[in-house]
Amino acid sequence: KADIFCLQETKLQAGQVELDLPGYLQFWNSAKKKGYSGTAVFTRTAPLEVTYGIGLPEHDTEGRVITCEFPGFFLVNCYTPNAQRGLSRLEYRMVWEDAFRAFLLSLDRSKPVILCGDLNVAHQEIDLKNPKPNRGNAGFTDEERGKMTSLLSAGFTDTFRWLYPDRTGGTADTKSEAKRS
């Protein structure tokens, strides 16, 4: 049994569902908009503190971040905004990325950070099965990939890529466009 597990894109409002998971504490962050985004953390160990969002009202209405502080680390569960078809939210996403990275770095100054979640980006071509037809699509724009590079350059590690440096198509998947599969 997992000590901690995290969900993204829960699309649930507070009290909409009751999960019977004996031994787990549950923490939910719901979007103000019904049926949209949301995150949840389930843990067997009580966190010292749980915070919701990144502390900026312009970014904290979509239920995208839960941070659990434990004695030796912060666990951050994140559901990064999608740039959407036609890249209609790309500009917002870029602003969000900078604010989120600053949030992570502020935590990292006091203790290590474990970031998990759906970051909505394929950082490298190796992360997609068919990268060429996806170049410029949401999740694989130069801008989004650049923000992921900035996160990694700030000292964070893509643990999947660290463990499996040559595995193709392993970190990004989408159900919305057949050409990505």
Residue ranges and their predicted role:
Residues 4, 23-25, 96-181:
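Metal-dependent phosphoesterases centered on the DNase I-like endonuclease/exonuclease/phosphatase
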Residues 11, 16-85:
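Structured beta-strand-rich core segments of catalytic domains in phosphoester-bond hydrolases
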Residues 1-6, 10:
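Proline-aspartate-enriched helix->loop->beta-strand connector
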Residues 61-63, 70, 91, 95, ...:
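Residues forming well-ordered secondary-structure scaffolds
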Residues 8, 79, 116:
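A cross-family glycoside hydrolase active-site/sugar-binding cleft signature
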Residues 55-56, 81-97, 132-137:
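Surface-exposed cleft-lining segments at the edges of enzyme active sites
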Residues 77, 87, 94, 105-108:
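Active-site acidic/histidine proton-transfer and metal-coordination neighborhood
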